[in-house]
Amino acid sequence: MQNQVAQSMKNSIKVYLVNSFTRDHCGGNPAGVVLNPPKLTTEQKIAIAQQVGFSETAFVYSGDDTDFKVDFFTAEGEVDFCGHATLAVFFTLSSLKLLKPGDYSQKTKAGILTVTINHDNIVMEQTLPITRKGPCVNDVAKALGILPEVIEKTDL
């Protein structure tokens, strides 16, 4: 992973620019990391994510019942979880010597997940994916003449 720092123009918020899944500091999947930001509205987080310009930006807070609370934002809104941004968060915390090797818990919209920092890597826990069995929602919606979102809201 590699790490750079950028300043958000608004509110002088420090954003770490981190590439996860790199080899020899090349390539990877970029994410923004904001550590202990001031109280921000959803709109402000979206604006920062837009300014960062990566697929996700993580906002990291001290947790009440976990080690950390992490919010993930895209340029369009909040998402439940982001794997490469999670790795970016813990790489940043470790690089800044704020964390030692060990197990840490993070609260996300996807639930409470464990992240393990080792001397040479970071491993994260993810919830099992939800798989849907049955006909394609888009096909059913088209046949019924309704929007797919109507069916998706039912969780069927």
What are these regions (language model features)?
Residues N3-F81, L87-L156:
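Active-site proximal loop and beta-alpha junction motif in alpha/beta enzyme cores
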